[in-house]
Swiss-Prot record:
Tissues in which the protein is found: Expressed by the venom gland.
Signal sequence segment: 1-27
Stated name of the protein: Mastoparan-VT4
Native source organism of the sequence: Vespa tropica
Intervals holding AXPX repeats: 27-30, 31-34, 35-38, 41-44
Cellular compartments annotated: Secreted
Amino acid sequence: MKNPILILFTAFIALLGFFGMSAEALADPKADPLAGPNPDADPEAINLKAIAPLAKKLLG
């Protein structure tokens, strides 16, 4: 039999991840799961559209 503390810890982490993702989905229900971060929902999200031209300019 495996260590019961390890099993309980793994189950706790799995539930924490599940409920954390559910809370994020509830916070922004219109968000497309395949799209990037929504800047309106997350003001600290990285603006990739603004970074892409700069990266192209730097990398050539």
